[in-house]
Amino acid sequence: MTTAGSCGRNGGFMVSIKEVAKHAGVAISTVSKVLNGYPNVSEETKKKVQDAIKELNYIPNSIAAALSSKQFGRIALVLDPNRQTQAIDQIFMQYLVGALDKAKELNVEVVTIFPSMIAGMTAEEITRSFLSQSISGVVIYGMSKEDKVLQKLIREKQFACVVVDAPIVNSRTTSISIDQEQAQYDVAKKTVLDDNCKRVLHIAGRRDGYVTDQRLKGMKRLVKDLDLTMMVRQGDFSELTARNVALKYAKNKDVVVCASDLMAIGAMNALIDMDIFRPVCGFDGITLMGYVGKQMNTIRQDFYSISSRAVEEVHQLMNGGEGHQVIMPHSIVKMYYKDIIC
């Protein structure tokens, strides 16, 4: 717990927790409670303390020690296993193993941060928490467009950041992804031309996803280039939702283009249940596609390599590198059972 002995700097002078308390007009114990995330502090009081901390540039002893120690240089991996279902845990594990292997190679320590661990925290609170853990680099996987807190954390440039699948770049932030727009265009074009399709049902991902917008942009370009018609429905990257969309709309379409493999599996099973054939394509290249029975085109992403490169990039930023955009390769494949069995 942060105590009265904590200190910071303001224009070269040490700032004590006592001065923060005085500036905010609260007790020292109240400042300590805010710093340590105690729940029994009103929002009004919390704001007073946070404003005082910011104005005085107060840094607790635990953070100051981390800043000056040789341990300062850990990398936080911000990723959410709960955003996946058990069917595509493969993506989460490939991200994790890719990051851990590269971190071992670079001799840096990584810390896994799940969203539940920082839920409800402000950008300032996350900053203090990360600094207290000697974190100076952050890799964020699949950030939502609605996540204003993490976006603020990136804008403030306190940490070297790499964002996976989000087009955000600044002097201390690198973006890494495949070319989502082109990949969606490529796999949909092949599927459409293979079966001479004209009427497209596109099952898109979550509305708050950066990749959803990029993949939809690819589809709109394809529709224009090939003079197609297209109906777009949200599938939320859910197998069940995509199944229900296909049951309702696929019968009157020539092809079903899905923005993820899991949704493609849901759509294909809906078509099988309706006893009709429509070509379906997915996106990601997960192993589960090989078990469906009906082979579908998909985009293969190398999640291991993407995550490994993300850690390499954040390490470069931590050592003075400049933020930039990294485009990783993709390929169109069909997943066959004989190719995935061990």
Question: What are these language model-derived features?
Answer:
Residues 2-12, 74-189, 249-251, 255:
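Alpha-helical recognition/docking segments in bacterial nutrient-uptake
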Residues 103-115, 202, 220-241:
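Short beta-strand elements in bilobed, periplasmic/extracellular small-molecule ligand-binding domains
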Residues 1-73:
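N-terminal helix-turn-helix DNA-binding module of bacterial transcription factors
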Residues 145-146, 208, 215, 262-264:
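Alpha-helix capping/helix-boundary segments
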Residues 76-78, 201, 257, 281:
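Short, well-ordered beta-strand segments
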Residues 251-342:
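Flexible loop/turn connectors
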Residues 187-226, 322-340:
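An alpha-beta-alpha
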Residues 176-202, 239-247, 264, 301-319:
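Hydrophobic alpha-helical segments within soluble ligand-binding/sensing domains
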